Amino acid sequence: MLERSLLLATLLSALCSANLFGNNSYVYYYQSAFRPPDGWHLHGGAYEVVNVFTESSNAGTTGCTVGAIYWSKNFSAASVAMTAPQNGMSWSTEQFCTAHCNFTDFVVFVTHCYKSSHGSCPLTGLIPQNHIRISAMKNSSLFYNLTVAVTKYPRFKSLQCVNNMTSVYLNGDLVFTSNETKDVSAAGVHFKAGGPITYKVMREVKALAYFVNGTAQDVILCDGSPTGLLACQYNTGNFSDGFYPFTNSSLVKEKFIVYRESSVNTTLELTNFTFSNVSNATPNTGGVQTIQLYQTSTAQSGYYNLNFSFLSSFIYKASDYMYGSYHPSCKFRLETINNGLWFNSLSVSLGYGPIQGGCKQSVFANRATCCYAYSYNGPSLCKGVYRGELTKSFECGLLVFVTKTDGSRIQTRNEPFTLTQHNYNNITLDRCVEYNIYGRVGQGFITNVTNYAINYNYLADGGMAILDTSGAIDIFVVQGEYGLNYYKVNPCEDVNQQFVVSGGKLVGILTSRNETGSQPLENQFYIKIINGTRRSRRSITGNVTNCPYVTYGKFCIKPDGSISTIVPKELEHFVAPLLNVTENVLIPDSFNLTVTDEYIQTRMDKVQINCLQYVCGNSLECRKLFQQYGPVCDNILSVVNSVGQKEDMELLHFYSSTKPSGFNTPVLSNVSTGEFNISLLLTPPSSASGRSFIEDLLFTSVESVGLPTDDAYKKCTAGPLGFLKDLACAREYNGLLVLPPIITAEMQTLYTSSLVASMAFGGITSVGAIPFATQLQARINHLGITQSLLLKNQEKIAASFNKAIGHMQEGFRSTSLALQQIQDVVNKQSSILTETMASLNKNFGAISSVLQDIYQQLDSIQADAQVDRIITGRLSSLSVLASAKQAEYYRVSQQRELATQKINECVKSQSIRYSFCGNGRHVLTIPQNAPNGIVFIHFTYTPESFVNVTAIVGFCVNPANASQYAIVPANGRGIFIQVNGSYYITARDMYMPRDITAGDIVTLTSCQANYVSVNKTVITTFVDNDDFDFDDELSKWWNDTKHELPDFDEFNYTVPILDIGSEIDRIQGVIQGLNDSLIDLETLSILKTYIKWPWYVWLAIAFATIIFILILGWLFFMTGCCGCCCGCFGIIPLMSKCGKKSSYYTTFDNDVVT
């Protein structure tokens, strides 16, 4: 209502103000008659300075001229301010004369002129002394005059021209306005001294102003700067710490259209004029004016076809002086008139007159532009057209009159014209654009997603677009040269783009785009803002243990825009509780080890709400309407932001209070895995080699698969002549004689010689072949047994491997079920968010939930009324979401407190509370990460059987020579029990009777319990049965009333419980199954046999060694290095040379070398 009042009110009698803000960088005009209430208000009236310059003087030496406009500067601006120095300028020809504003059609000026001489005041005439004149002039005529005493304006300080209602301000007060809004085309100040005059040229922008008692105290320009975007979108300049999503709607947008078809053919209408022969036409009676016209047809504009088919029975008569046709202005015949000729006007008529001169004279008489004559061998009944022939008779013919002018309004054609419009889909990518896609309009950021969508057959059945829940286009497809191209429409600005407010200051932008100058922050990118402008990237500086400002994950964003990493303070000590006992009459004497699991949610999923985008989507009309709702979005965001901030701080405190110092240090020693064999994963211990390094170097080793008996064979054949004992060292395996299959060269020589010798004398020496045959059979046995064992082991390996795979699959399946149960519990959080998104499809009583459809079907007022319902409904959904997140935060906060207690009491120590850490007496708890929480696996022992004992509270002792006293069990020692007439003490949680010692008791001074005896007057609530009747008293209050308890059997409720106990048992079974799958293979050994090199190899090595020594000695001798030889090797023939250098190179001090 405020803005509407500003536009409609008459402002001539209202004083207005124009205040300067921001180092004189902009001006804010507001009308004093319509001052808004205290607070922030968004409307027009702000003008940002875009150009500043000064002027010292322009009047010359004689002084300036008053009562006239002599100096002007040309502009094209929304506002121009001309200001004098702070002290102002006097109203005199020695300083100030005239200032004016030119609004193209009229000029507003202020001047003074107390002169009565002729021509002294050409515009205003004489102005009274000590008065000034404010006038408006149009076409050299004054239509507004206002004379003001100088007591109101003692000196000239400023004149400001504003396009809004052509307002003019003198010294900050409104002195002129009109109903027109026009830019300032020129302005100027005519003065001699007192300057300089400062000119400020401004452009108009919206502003958010803060008013106190009707006066603007602060102004924020809606100019696209970060501060302007934030303040003007949320209608406030005061922000609490947090993150504020924003949409930059001030970006310059391009436009493009996506057409359904690549080309459109449009067939234009073709008008037919059909002419025919006129029967019973009367001949003329003399002259062309008596020729009667028939079938006159006049074309208007468009395409025409003139049908003269009846002329086929007529004979065309060409022009022959005065005879026949006459059409020099028409270069066509009637038979070709439809060949695409262009006319500005066209009219055709038929007439019957003399062929002799009828056409030519008709053209001369301006009856037609062209005339075509046709003969049909008619009678000679037509009269002449010339003065001397008016009574003569001539042959009658058909005359076709054509009246035309050249142009482009009319075209003749033989067939309808088809206009082909080629549609080119020039899609603008990767920038904010306004689009018209298949008839749906909007704005968005278009990206090509063909590479991602081409394999999923989207829109494969001829569809053109996929719409989102608001009815706007989400994905559309365009037929390209090489196939279908898919495009995604995103909001012009990323929904996740948020302003960061810390310490009440706008310090940065958090966005999902990796822009220049940004730095990564968790899964977002942070851009620092200094003094309202972006700053280049800075690294994260320093660590803090806590953050009183805004936090994002583990990062603290400070009021100066810097970022620090939050490193929670670690715990330095562990605290273990003392043992305690519970009160039971039955004392357990046997126990079972029990494993129980417990899931506790410690964090919640935070949401980021772009309120404006959720409510209005891309609808510009809805966004304009939404401005009337004020700070409702700010209120919702403040709730969500505060929840997120508290969540981060409590989560950091949770980890800082539970994370022990050095918890990441692994302990790898003294690790016992019990029956679970993981030896295959450990490094085997080193063992001594069977041969030395020299043996491995000087002998060739051959490895083969051996049997367990091969180790004994190797020991038996050890030594230099061990090969002679080969057959003697044979061993038996399962009753079979076996020898290793490897035969050395010595063995081969030995057995070959034995075989050859056995064949030398036939049967006499044949017994010599027995060793050869025996060793051969033993080695064949060795190979056969080895192959059999390999096959058996292979079968065992396959069976065991299959069994292990089965158990692993079962383990994975069991783990998957446990995780699924965790997921089911955690996913309960998203139900309210799902409901919120589903609200986008609800119409809330409107005709549709699609905003664009509403504005297309209804007029503006009706559409706003319908959209108002949707806005109210969606805001309600957001409010429900904010309330749900707030309630969820309180619930999760309590869960975190419980988790802290569990970690401190169950994980870091043994709990003394029964069934607090699992079910039963606590032994050990192992925590595991889970989605949004922690899973505790509690190991406890629970009673299996109990012993029923007689418990004694204490003993009363009556000594012979002293007063009586009592003894009771000391705290934590257990209880006194009686067993078979004897007294013992045992623990409360485990039956372990033992003798009572002095350390187990506490001595009391008396055996009696102390009570305090009081009478009835002390405690007035005590009553006797004889003076209080309950039935009588209750009848006063509960008479004639009926009370029914609810049927709790019908009370159904569902609580999500995480139960992975059975899955843990199945995993334990899988572990046992994996242990069972260990393979007990038949023992095989590796037999390593060393083969000595032949004699010629050793001979070659000896020759090579001798040659190497000779060459080395010769090198030492020739290079004068024999000292080394003498000292190291003691070569006697060289001793005489050892005291000096070689004689070949001996020189003395007095030698001259040339």
Swiss-Prot record:
Residue ranges that the UniProt entry lists as topological domain Extracellular: 19-1096
Residues carrying covalently attached carbohydrate according to the record: 23, 74, 102, 139, 145, 164, 179, 213, 238, 248, 265, 272, 277, 307, 426, 448, 514, 531, 543, 580, 592, 670, 677, 948, 961, 980, 1015, 1039, 1052, 1075
Keyword tags: Cleavage on pair of basic residues, Coiled coil, Fusion of virus membrane with host endosomal membrane, Fusion of virus membrane with host membrane, Glycoprotein, Host membrane, Host-virus interaction, Membrane, Signal, Transmembrane, Transmembrane helix, Viral attachment to host cell, Viral envelope protein, Viral penetration into host cytoplasm, Virion, Virulence, Virus endocytosis by host, Virus entry into host cell
A Pfam family assignment: CoV_S2_C
SUPFAM superfamilies according to UniProt: Coronavirus S2 glycoprotein
Record site feature (Cleavage), residues: 538-539, 691-692
Annotated spans, Heptad repeat 2 (HR2): 1025-1106
Coiled coil: 823-867, 1056-1084
CDD domains xrefs: gammaCoV_Spike_SD1-2_S1-S2_S2
UniProt similarity note: Belongs to the gammacoronaviruses spike protein family.
Name of the featured protein: Spike glycoprotein
Gene (UniProt): S
